[in-house]
Amino acid sequence: MFEICNPFPGRLLASAMPFGPHDLDQALWDLYRSEGVTHVLMLVSDAEARAATRQDLAALYRAHGLTVWQHPIPDFEVPQDPTAFRAMLHQVADALQDPGTTLVVHCAAGRGRTGLFLACWAQEALGLSPEAALQWVRRYIPGAVETRAQEEFVLTWPLRVLPQTP
């Protein structure tokens, strides 16, 4: 698990999926609990989570009182709806305004989709350029933003959210 420094009062973390194949020592869930995680953003679908962990992760999180948001992105791919994706970026920024928030973002390995999300979040919430956002996230998560398509999405993020002219 990686702590992502940010200027907001809340804490921002990134990780692999608990109980999944990248949670090698099966300790992430205990780490979530010891770190006081209050919010989880899942970038995996329920089906992907269930296939990897053999349980309903969203239900587990909710049963322990966590706020759960889901914005599934297929593995190694990019978001298909920039408007909904941008709304999720802002939802995370809003949640981090609360000093009692500890929010973790995860996909399967915690690198590709998680890195993509955080690099776009850094552009929206921190005002970083696309190139600086990519460097920023890779400083915290080695190997973040795994595919060329994901990298291109990050680098062209500002163009995807500009108002469209007729």
Features from the language model and the residues they span:
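Conserved SAM/SAH-binding loop-helix junction
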Residues: 113
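Short cysteine clusters
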Residues: 107
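Conserved G/P- and acidic residue-centered "switch" motifs that form tight phosphate/ATP-binding loops
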Residues: 110
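Cys-dependent protein tyrosine phosphatase-like superfamily
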Residues: 1-104, 116-166
